[in-house]
Design a protein with these regions (language model features):
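Flexible beta-alpha connector loops of hexameric P-loop NTPases
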Residues: 66-73, 105-110
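A short, small-residue-rich loop immediately preceding and capping a beta-strand
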Residues: 56-59, 68-70, 90-95, 127-138
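Conserved catalytic cores of soluble enzyme domains
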Residues: 96-177
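Intrinsically disordered, low-complexity segments enriched in small/flexible residues
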Residues: 1-56, 60-67
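A structural preference for short, pocket-lining loop segments at secondary-structure junctions
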Residues: 49-62, 77-104
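Short glycine-rich loop/turn motifs
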Residues: 42-46, 55, 90-91, 117-120, ...
């Protein structure tokens, strides 16, 4: 990340928060007993903090941890966070850099991912805004969150949002993209 002049996930959170705002990190040990090799907390840092003097739920993908790809712990964590958002009527800010679903875990993740996407649309209907800021690759499932957000900001010359890369397009259609 440093060699590419990118901020780390926690630095992005600190930069976003109001000066001297505390950050209450939620579910940092999610997936502690998971054997997928992702370690505790999954591939996002999530918590509550003040942004423009308003309590917000902040979710930051850890792009330096398996490309921010989503494992079971991360998908479960997102569902639980969605419940907390709705119960506490919080707007959400996503700091996105995600390779989408970790393919070896996809059979364990797709149901949770679908529920998570449904939660995003339900929150929008309730007037609970979702804002996404994309800092790097947002691939496949990682592209859905900014695509479904009420507001999306893409970092100039860095953000890339796509559902499939050239190898997958070639495999599926036999065409070069």
């Amino acid at each position: 990340a440093r060699s590419r002049k990118k901020m780390l996930a926690r630095e992005r959170i600190e930069y976003l928060l109001d000066k001297d705002s505390p950050f209450l990190e939620l579910l940092p040990l999610s997936g502690l007993k998971n054997d997928s090799g992702f370690g505790p907390g999954g591939t996002n840092i999530t918590g509550i903090g003040l942004v423009s003097n308003k309590l917000c739920m902040i979710q930051s993908n850890v792009g330096t941890k398996k490309g921010g790809s989503v494992d079971y712990a991360t998908s479960y964590k997102s569902l639980r966070i969605g419940e907390i958002i709705e119960k506490n009527k919080l707007p959400t800010i996503n700091l996105v850099e995600s390779g989408g679903v970790n393919l070896p875990d996809q059979d364990k993740i797709f149901i949770n991912a679908g529920k998570n996407f449904k939660q995003i649309t339900q929150r929008s209907k309730l007037g609970l805004s979702t804002i996404s800021l994309v800092f790097g690759n947002a691939t496949a499932g990682g592209a859905y969150v900014p695509g479904m957000s009420d507001y999306t900001i893409l970092q100039k010359n860095a953000a890339k949002v796509f559902l499939a890369g050239p190898p997958l397009v070639k495999m599926a259609t036999n065409e070069i993209s």
